[in-house]
């Protein structure tokens, strides 16, 4: 399970010292929809070189949801060159053999760490997965994706 929140930074304070650890305190407030429940679809995964790959399939255990979906992408490390494209795919088939459609598309990632929240009113089917495509010889990325659907 994962808790997903689109947030606004309320306050940040830090204490800096040359001889001790730096302490960072931050407060965030939900900016829309409050806290939502979801699942960790793609745990911390590191890519290497050009490839197309998929997460494990998430079975929501019920039929299509017409309320839409939401997801967070966190890129914890990015390579010196290349690109990363991440989408959430949905299907009524557990094998993704037919009727595969894209529920969410994240902004293309290049050479810097980032995070992004996406949501959509598109109907999501029972089965969902993350597709990620890396292009470029030095396209090493470490990423995490969480996903949920509105009820």
Tell me what each language-model feature is.
Residues 45-47, 134-151:
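C-terminal interaction-tip segments
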Residues 56-89, 127-132:
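Beta-rich globular "head" domains
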Residues 21-23, 67-73, 121-142:
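Noncatalytic modules at the cell exterior or secretory-pathway interfaces
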Residues 34-67:
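Solvent-exposed, flexible loop/coil segments flanking beta-strands in beta-rich domains
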Residues 1-34, 119-123:
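Short beta-strand and beta-hairpin "edge-sheet" elements
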Residues 87-93, 148:
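Predominantly extracellular/luminal cell-surface or secreted proteins
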Residues 100-110:
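Solvent-exposed serine/threonine-rich low-complexity stretches and specific carbohydrate-binding patches
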Residues 54-58, 113-121:
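Exposed aromatic-hydrophobic patches
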């Amino acid at each position: 399970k994962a808790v997903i929140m689109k947030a606004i930074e309320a306050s940040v304070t830090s204490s800096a010292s040359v001889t001790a650890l730096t302490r960072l305190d931050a407060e965030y407030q939900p900016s829309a929809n409050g806290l939502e429940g979801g699942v960790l679809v793609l745990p911390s995964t590191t890519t290497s070189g050009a490839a197309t790959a998929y997460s494990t399939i998430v079975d929501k255990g019920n039929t299509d949801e017409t309320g839409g979906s939401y997801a967070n992408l966190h890129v914890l490390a990015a390579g010196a060159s290349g690109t990363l494209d991440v989408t959430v795919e949905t299907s009524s088939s557990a094998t993704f053999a037919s009727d595969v459609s894209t529920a969410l598309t994240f902004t293309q990632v290049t050479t810097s760490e980032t995070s992004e929240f996406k949501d959509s009113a598109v109907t999501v089917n029972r089965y969902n997965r993350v597709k990620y495509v890396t292009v470029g010889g030095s396209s090493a990325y470490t990423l995490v994706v969480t996903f949920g659907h509105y009820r």
